[in-house]
Amino acid sequence: MIRLIPVPTPFAVGEVNCYLVEDDPLTLVDTGPDLGTSLAALEAGLAEHGRKVEDLERIVLTHQHIDHVGLAATLAERSGAEVCAIAPLAPWMERWHESIDADDRFGEELMLRHGVPEEQAAAVRKLSASFHDWGRNVRVDRPLEDGGALEFAGRTWKVLHRPGHSPS
């Protein structure tokens, strides 16, 4: 059974969808940002299905946006779960602040190159920097390769690397 656990974010997009895969190993797909309200909602969602964070055995990260990966380190520490992500995301997650800073610099440079006024580009970068502490370094125990497989007792998922929404 795959269960939807909606987790609130402070972003205009609203909730992020996290998924609990009730199989062996017990797996959570995406985490929400590292905020108290997000963690509380995730814990409540797990409890609705008779689970708690400490029961998690695997965490799968779909891409590096903070609303999808922010709680990964906290959940991995509390549960001891294996963390899986597409291979290009592994070094990014293991150097959180360095990576997110580089993304912000790239975004600001891109805006400036395309004619966005400096004060607006700087304002966007400042806003983005305010989110940096909503995630932190986490070791990716299992980098996933495009076309590879993620095994469960009752199913196998094919890994598909489809960048576009994010670089990873």
Predicted feature residues:
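Conserved beta-strand positions that form and line the central face of beta-propeller blades
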Residues: 4, 28, 143, 149, ...
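Active-site HxH/HxHxD metal-binding segment of metal-dependent hydrolases
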Residues: 14, 37, 47-152
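Conserved beta-strand segments of alpha/beta enzyme cores
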Residues: 1-3, 82, 142, 156-158
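Short, glycine/acidic-enriched loop or turn micro-motifs at the edges of active sites
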Residues: 33-35, 66, 164, 168
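Conserved beta-strand hairpin/beta-sheet module of binuclear metal-dependent hydrolase folds
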Residues: 1-49, 55, 98
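Glycine-centered loop/turn positions within well-structured domains
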Residues: 27, 67, 91, 157, ...
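Core dinuclear metal-dependent hydrolase active-site scaffold
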Residues: 20, 147-168
